[in-house]
């Protein structure tokens, strides 16, 4: 049968195993002495209780699959053969069956997918959803991959494959359900935090948790962070629980809706000021001496800027050029400029080449930036052998803060403009 059409739930494999009959009281010591020769398989009973036969309580111990009766004794290990003769043990062959329960996901897929096709070993778990990025070679086997993951992981109810790269402005994926329920509404847990989301309508990456941990380590209680592409709030909400105030924004109206839900579910309502707007416009609102007065004092200044989207958000740094010229001098001074944490992608391999390329790119938005000011450069992941995702932390320089503000950028109009600004009680 074509493996692409196998009913994985009823998978059954017949094998022939050699077993040895011996008394119950000798079974444990025999297994201990010949442990490397015993058949071991997940959820497989390697010792069978045969009960009383001719007045003796017997056990059947299964041996490794490569020990076959027709090869006994010539091709069997000498110490095992000696033990069999010494104890007058019976060698028998028995038909056994292996099912879904006896294999890990990787083992099962290795048996079902043809040799030469890479086995998908990594996938993201988001709530009850398993998320794959299958290659062109793996796509013909997507159903068997999905069904295997579904049945081997009881917490997984839906398996999806991403169809294309993230091209739209919201960075939301186009997904295909390849197994399980067609339900992309889920609740994801990250430590003690819960996040409600629709995986198809918002950007989410569970694998960025370690990176969020790293950036959060920069923050101190009572500081204010500006999370410009906050999504459904994984960074903002965790920062708020640390005692920080967070100005958070996302242009995606669906992400904004879930942000408000998650803010309430995690009980940080008073710590977040939530926008559904263009990132640059939010910065200009907070910097503007008049508009900033609408908001509580603890949201009128920010110590850190976190930008984890879009693909290359260094270009958004132009909004910080001239910060001191377009802000309230009572709020902003040369000694309280923010630290910027920006992510992006770079095609260079060595550290020096990466830094040099990034310096060239960032100077287009912050002309006085110098690579020596970088506090930390972190490779988040290797997307492929020629492309790295990075996060770079650096302080906004006094020279750039005192420069004339940029006039090169324009705002993106939010879908729900009437709801794009926070409601202030």
Regions found by a protein language model. Name each.
Residues 1-425:
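SAM-dependent transferase fold signal centered on methyltransferase-like domains
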């Amino acid at each position: 049968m074509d493996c692409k059409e196998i009913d994985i739930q009823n998978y059954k494999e017949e094998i022939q195993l050699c077993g040895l009959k011996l008394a119950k009281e000798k079974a444990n010591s025999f297994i201990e002495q010949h442990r490397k020769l015993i058949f071991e398989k997940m959820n497989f009973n390697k010792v069978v209780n045969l009960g009383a036969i001719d007045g003796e309580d017997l056990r059947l111990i299964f041996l490794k699959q490569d020990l076959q009766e027709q090869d006994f004794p010539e091709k069997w290990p000498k110490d095992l053969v000696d033990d069999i003769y010494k104890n007058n043990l019976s060698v028998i062959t028995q038909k056994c069956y292996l099912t879904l329960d006896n294999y890990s996901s990787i083992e099962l897929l290795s048996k079902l997918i043809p040799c030469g096709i890479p086995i998908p070993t990594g996938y993201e778990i988001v709530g009850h959803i398993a998320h794959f990025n299958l290659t062109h070679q793996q796509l013909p086997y997507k159903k068997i991959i999905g069904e295997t993951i579904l049945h081997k992981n009881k917490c997984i109810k839906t398996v999806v494959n991403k169809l294309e790269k993230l091209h739209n402005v919201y960075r939301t994926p186009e997904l295909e359900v390849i197994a399980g329920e067609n339900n992309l509404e889920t609740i994801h847990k990250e430590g003690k935090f819960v996040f409600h989301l629709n995986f198809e309508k918002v950007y989410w990456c569970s694998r960025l948790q370690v990176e969020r941990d790293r950036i959060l380590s920069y923050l101190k209680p009572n500081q204010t962070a500006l999370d410009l592409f906050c999504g459904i709030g994984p960074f903002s909400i965790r920062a708020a629980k640390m005692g920080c105030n967070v100005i958070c924004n996302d242009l995606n109206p669906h992400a904004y809706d879930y942000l408000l839900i998650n803010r309430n579910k995690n009980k940080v309502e008073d710590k977040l000021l939530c926008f559904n707007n263009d990132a640059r416009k939010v910065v200009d609102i907070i910097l503007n001496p008049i508009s900033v007065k609408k908001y509580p004092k603890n949201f009128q200044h920010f110590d850190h800027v976190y930008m984890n989207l879009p693909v290359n958000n260094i270009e958004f740094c132009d909004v910080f050029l001239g910060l001191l010229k377009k802000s309230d001098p009572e709020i902003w001074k040369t000694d309280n400029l923010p630290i910027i944490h920006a992510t992006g992608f770079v095609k260079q391999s060595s550290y020096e080449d990466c830094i040099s390329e990034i310096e060239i790119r960032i100077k287009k938005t912050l002309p006085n930036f110098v690579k020596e000011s970088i506090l930390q450069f972190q490779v988040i992941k290797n997307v492929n052998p020629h492309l790295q995702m990075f996060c770079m932390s650096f302080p906004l320089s006094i020279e750039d803060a005192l420069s004339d503000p940029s006039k090169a950028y324009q705002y993106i109009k939010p879908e729900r403009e009437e709801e794009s600004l926070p409601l202030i009680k």
